[in-house]
Amino acid sequence: MTNMRKSHPLLKIINHSLIDLPAPSNISVWWNFGSLLGVCLGLQILTGLFLAMHYTSDTLTAFSSVTHICRDVNYGWIIRYLHANGASMFFICLFLHVGRGMYYGSYSYLETWNIGVILLFAVMATAFMGYVLPWGQMSFWGATVITNLLSAIPYVGTSLVEWIWGGFSVDKATLTRFFAFHFILPFIITALVIVHLLFLHETGSNNPTGLNSNADKIPFHPYYTIKDILGFIVMFLFLMILVLFSPDMLGDPDNYTPANPLNTPPHIKPEWYFLFAYAILRSIPNKLGGVLALILSILVLVLLPLLHTSAQRSLMFRPISQCLFWILVADLFTLTWIGGQPVEHPFIIIGQLASILYFLIILGLMPLAGILENKIMKI
């Protein structure tokens, strides 16, 4: 009699995706982040569901409903902080996952990569709308500033902003629709994740060498299930340290002040995971130019397969490209720091130089390094 997991129509899909999946024998810890992202998504949906049971999306009661969750609901404080800091963990894993894809040339799986970029946009949109929901000062002004960027679109900009707001300013209608979208988007993200995995399992996983690994595969279970579980334990350890010891470390103190349209905070800034893009936006004096640079800072990932000039897929054996990659990582840290600073000298010029370097490395220097390495190795 055949094993049920191999014959049952539903279990068969799970078996081919998680148990008997042939995986390269040499994939490193950098391949853990996919499963960690799945766990983060599950955690966010679960904690978000419990928060939604107590939250009210009304401008008069939103702030006090979040306070009520933290003070009066059983374990409400831990659910709220797991959700807020879980988002930070989500983005840490997301950035490392994308970085891994860039380093090891995983972008040559076009469909998987492009769905991944769409997922990145969807997660960023969800996180932005979630940040508006507590209706603190930074929620309100962050929503006002970021939605206002759409007014830079010629001709239809102003109408588009008012349509998104549901009025002439960020108000009750805006909060209600942001809550609705924030609730539905994670389920759309889950559907996209399934498509992402579907495309990945069509080709099989990449590996650190970038070479074909068909000759050397091992079953996913037990080898990589154990490895993934270790990843979960480490991630939850860091998350719980953050939640239980310093839950507000990554938040903004201004968000503990109820939203007031008559009082602007001294420095309007988004959550830390958007600061690099925010710095690129601010580095261009023109509004439309800034918005385009902001979108391009993420959309540039779609161009990576077209910009790949090297005969080798991975950066593992390419020292010049490796140097450029780590300069790019340092540049992103610089942009994140600049995004949190006020718009004054010397931060303006540092931000502008870091923004130029970001696009220069991805669009110019990396492809040139690939050609140079081919020449050096006579490929």
UniProtKB/Swiss-Prot annotation:
Heme b b562 binds at H83, H182. It is found in: Mitochondrion inner membrane. A ubiquinone binds at H201. The keyword Kinase does not apply. GO terms for cellular component: mitochondrial inner membrane; respiratory chain complex III. Gene3D superfamilies: Cytochrome Bc1 Complex, Chain C. Keywords: Electron transport, Heme, Iron, Membrane, Metal-binding, Mitochondrion, Mitochondrion inner membrane, Respiratory chain, Transmembrane, Transmembrane helix, Transport, Ubiquinone. The keyword Transmembrane helix applies. GO terms for molecular function: metal ion binding; ubiquinol-cytochrome-c reductase activity. One of its GO terms (biological process) is mitochondrial electron transport, ubiquinol to cytochrome c. It comes from the Eukaryota. It is a multi-pass membrane protein. Its main location: mitochondrion. Heme 1 (or BL or b562) is low-potential and absorbs at about 562 nm, and heme 2 (or BH or b566) is high-potential and absorbs at about 566 nm. Belongs to the cytochrome b family. The cytochrome bc1 complex contains 11 subunits: 3 respiratory subunits (MT-CYB, CYC1 and UQCRFS1), 2 core proteins (UQCRC1 and UQCRC2) and 6 low-molecular weight proteins (UQCRH/QCR6, UQCRB/QCR7, UQCRQ/QCR8, UQCR10/QCR9, UQCR11/QCR10 and a cleavage product of UQCRFS1). This cytochrome bc1 complex then forms a dimer. This is Cytochrome b. The lineage of its organism: Eukaryota, Metazoa, Chordata, Craniata, Vertebrata. The gene is MT-CYB.
